[in-house]
């Protein structure tokens, strides 16, 4: 399973990604939030035992942290997407500018289970979004955004305007939910230590919070305790390593920060009802992790409710 890391910069970054082949499931570790648009092909996003399908023409959001994705080229055409990465500070600055300079009243009343539980969102791009990313594609091809942070900031401002002035939806909710810089900092530290051999107390210290304050804020954001959340994230990563690599069980346990193999096997069995070896034997194959009917239905339902 291939891995990529996002290197944080001081400005929003806009880039195009092209892949002519299916590289399988890849791990992406984001230190910034991402808004993306699929020009050609399909993207699959994996979360635990579910798979979510993003199609050509879809606008999507990926929050900070680990994402497991697979990009599928279109028939006779490579997979192409445009990604816009930003921090909460950049988001705050641009939204404040839109509010003060243009009197834009920014509100969001959308709430759903997906917004609360998933670290991504997607919906079909509407006409102004399609035109915007077609223009961005031309700019990237011409190189007019290269080494020009002012141009990137202006494009980011336009994109945010198109989203926040649109009807309430999961992407808008996710976007506005990442304005809090303090929360952003806590999430960055938590995500960067998922596979570190440190205690919850040490993570709280790195967030400049008392253990009690950290646990309270953590529960507000994630709806569970730090210990349970970290174990779940490690098991999710281990499960994908089992079905996408030939690594030994002990090696996977170590890579996912479990103290020993027996402890890893015990927790995995508790979560998935079988040992890692049995899970690998049952689930490896070409049909593994196809989009579930529930996941596809949820995407369609969201699209209908937003565009209706």
PLM segments and residue spans:
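N-terminal regulatory/effector-sensing and dimerization cores
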Residues: 5-110, 145
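Short hydrophobic/aromatic patch on the recognition helix
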Residues: 57, 214-218, 263-264, 268
């Amino acid at each position: 399973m291939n891995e990529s890391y996002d290197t944080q910069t001081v400005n929003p970054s806009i880039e195009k990604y092209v892949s002519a082949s299916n590289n399988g499931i890849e791990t992406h570790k984001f230190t910034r939030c991402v808004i993306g648009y699929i020009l050609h092909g399909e993207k699959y996003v994996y979360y635990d035992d579910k798979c979510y399908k993003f199609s050509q023409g879809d606008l999507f959001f990926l929050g900070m942290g680990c994402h497991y994705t697979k990009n599928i080229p279109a028939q006779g055409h490579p997979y192409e997407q445009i990604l816009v990465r930003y921090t909460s500070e950049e988001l705050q600055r641009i939204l404040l500018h839109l509010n003060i300079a243009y009197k834009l009243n920014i509100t969001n009343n959308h709430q759903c289970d997906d917004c609360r539980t998933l670290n991504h969102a997607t919906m079909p791009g509407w006409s102004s979004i399609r035109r915007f990313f077609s223009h961005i594609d031309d700019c990237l091809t011409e190189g007019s955004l290269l080494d020009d942070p002012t141009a990137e900031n202006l494009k980011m401002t336009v994109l945010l305007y198109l989203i926040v002035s649109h009807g309430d939806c999961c992407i808008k909710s996710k976007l506005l939910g990442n304005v809090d810089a303090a929360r952003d900092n806590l999430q960055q530290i938590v995500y960067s230590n998922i596979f570190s051999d440190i205690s919850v107390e040490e993570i709280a210290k790195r967030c400049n919070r008392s253990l009690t304050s950290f646990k309270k804020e953590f529960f507000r954001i994630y709806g569970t305790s730090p210990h349970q959340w970290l174990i779940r994230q490690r098991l999710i990563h281990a499960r994908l390593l089992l079905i996408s690599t030939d690594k030994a069980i002990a090696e996977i346990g170590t890579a996912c920060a479990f103290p020993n193999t027996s402890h890893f096997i015990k927790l995995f069995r508790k979560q998935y009802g079988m040992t890692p070896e049995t899970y690998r034997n049952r689930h490896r194959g070409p049909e593994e992790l196809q989009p579930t009917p529930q996941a596809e239905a949820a995407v369609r339902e969201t699209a209908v409710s937003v565009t209706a």
